[in-house]
């Protein structure tokens, strides 16, 4: 029931069974199945959609803590004297401003100023950067970076060397602190450090995709089952539960975070997606910077907005957005916001219809349903 209520695009998710052999699997696949997770095909990976239910998992992350296996995410390492130059060319944020042990959100750009992908850039040293990229894009991202590597830099598609667990929620720090001698308060938001978690060498980053405080832990795959079990044991008394991709999606939607293939893709620019803050136009030219400068000067033809439904119906990905009887845009993501107890979504509309408070109509199976444009993000965690 809940899985259908919180459904995803058919192109991205389909139910899998133990007989599914062609899909890639994380090192925790057998654990997920032992826990009774509902497994789905996500970008060619056999991944848990939910364990105890999307509502319960969403609520746990907002109020306590949740543990996610996100080992399907890709890692690309760039090393050498030309590493910074290459990162600067292919991405729109300014990696030259990063300190060692700092990360930032950025876009991997096409020559047209649109997204190849969105990613996190971690500065390990002046000559070493680790990029965390989306699961379904990691091979094309690697090829794109290699294509533009005119620098003295080595590029490695390093995903097979990493597993990644994300512990998210207000109790996450205290749970993780039980397993590491590192003082986690010393790792600020969007920073990382190397240390041991449950005796396992790890990169511990204070990042996440839920709108909550939390940590993403990178480590060698052979330690996956031990670290998962140790974290779950440490988090049990605090009410931490395992969480799947379903809750990850509802959490990021409440937090107004973009999802590649929905809010952003290779037809979308950062300006349109409300991500102009990652476009550092003052740095040396990067892929697409000329087109981005021109778009900023000429003005936008569409903008990403948030909306709330006025009744109980849900505006899904691909549904039309109307002003009166005129279609002016399309929904990119939509669904229930369990913590806010509303039905919400994001859509692209022309700038003249983008003001907060604008009444719109979402076309749902041939019927017009009232909605209203609201400010993003829908949810901000308490400070």
Features from the language model and the residues they span:
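Acidic, proline/glycine-enriched N-terminal capping motif
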Residues: 2-106, 114-116
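Conserved, structured C-terminal
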Residues: 3-43, 48-49, 124-383
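Well-ordered mid-protein domain cores that form the structural environment of catalytic cofactors
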Residues: 94-148
């Amino acid at each position: 029931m809940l899985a259908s209520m919180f459904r995803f695009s058919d192109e991205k998710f389909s139910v899998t069974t133990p007989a599914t052999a062609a899909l890639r699997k994380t090192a925790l696949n057998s654990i997920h199945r032992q826990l009774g997770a509902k497994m789905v095909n996500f970008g060619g990976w056999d991944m848990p959609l939910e364990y105890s239910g999307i509502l319960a998992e969403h609520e746990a992350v907002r109020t306590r803590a949740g543990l996610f296996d996100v080992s399907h995410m890709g890692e690309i390492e760039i090393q050498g004297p030309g590493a910074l130059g290459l990162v600067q060319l292919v991405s729109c944020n300014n990696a030259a401003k990063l300190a060692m042990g700092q990360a930032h959100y950025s876009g991997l750009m096409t020559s047209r100023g649109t997204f190849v992908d969105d990613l996190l850039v971690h500065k390990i040293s002046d000559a070493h950067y680790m990029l965390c990229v989306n699961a379904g894009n990691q091979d094309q991202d690697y090829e794109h970076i290699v294509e533009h590597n005119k620098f003295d830099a080595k590029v490695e598609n390093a995903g097979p060397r990493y597993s990644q667990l994300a512990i998210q929620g207000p109790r996450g720090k205290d749970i993780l602190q039980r397993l590491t001698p590192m003082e986690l308060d010393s790792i600020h938001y969007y920073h990382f450090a190397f240390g041991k978690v449950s005796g396992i060498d790890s990169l511990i980053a204070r990042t996440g995709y839920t709108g909550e405080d939390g940590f993403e832990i990178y480590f060698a795959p052979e330690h996956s089952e031990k670290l998962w079990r140790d974290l779950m044991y440490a988090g049990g008394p605090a009410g931490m539960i395992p969480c799947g991709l379903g809750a990850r999606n509802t959490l990021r939607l409440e937090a107004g975070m973009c999802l590649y293939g929905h809010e952003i893709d290779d037809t979308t620019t950062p300006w349109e997606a409300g991500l102009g803050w990652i476009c550092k136009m003052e740095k040396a030219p990067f892929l697409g910077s000329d087109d981005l400068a021109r778009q900023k000067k000429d003005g936008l033809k569409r903008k990403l907005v948030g909306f709330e439904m006025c009744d109980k119906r849900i505006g899904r990905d691909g549904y039309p957005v109307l002003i009166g009887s005129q279609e002016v845009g399309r929904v990119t993501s939509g669904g229930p916001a369990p913590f806010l107890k509303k039905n919400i979504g994001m859509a692209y509309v022309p700038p003249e219809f983008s003001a907060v408070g604008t009444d719109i109509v979402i076309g749902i199976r041939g019927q017009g349903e009232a909605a209203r444009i609201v400010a993003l993000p829908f949810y901000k965690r308490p400070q």
